[in-house]
Amino acid sequence: MRKLLISFVTVAILSGCQTAEDGLTTSSTPTTVTGPAASAIAGDMASRLAEQIGPSATMTIKIEKDSSDFASALEAALKGWGYTVVTDGKVGRVGKDVKLVELGYSIDGVDGQVLARLSTPSIALGRAYTATAAGAVPASPLSIMQRN
């Protein structure tokens, strides 16, 4: 009888550890950021990336070719910080003192805000923005994740 009671208690406790069938859900959706908002977000994220990855004289940044306003604004912002940006996949000859850094980016809509993320093999940056017709303003602190 005692073993039966222990079995029921064990089953009751373990049943509380089960997850729902649907698993985790997110409300993140890819979104399009245009015009002044794209420029404001790209400019802010490019400046934060420049603070983290070092001087532009020793680095070439490679990003995937994209026709979105944000991609164009990000490329222009990085060039404004003095970085050489390659978008066609053809790096050409890179000097021995110049480091090639692959940069990934994403723009997602989350709860009425825009989540911008930039990532390299060594660091990832993320920040939420509130987009307006006149531009965009940061809605969260900058998130920095350094990889070893």
UniProtKB/Swiss-Prot annotation:
Disulphide bond pairs: none
Listed GO CC annotations: plasma membrane
Signal peptide bounds: 1-16
Lipidated residues (S-diacylglycerol cysteine): C17
Compartment(s) where it occurs, according to its Swiss-Prot or TrEMBL record: Cell membrane
Recorded topology in the membrane: Lipid-anchor
Keyword Signal: yes
Coiled-coil ranges (or none): none
Family per record: To A.tumefaciens Ti plasmid TrbH.
Name of the molecule in the record: Probable conjugal transfer protein TrbH
Classification of source organism: Bacteria, Pseudomonadati, Pseudomonadota, Alphaproteobacteria, Hyphomicrobiales
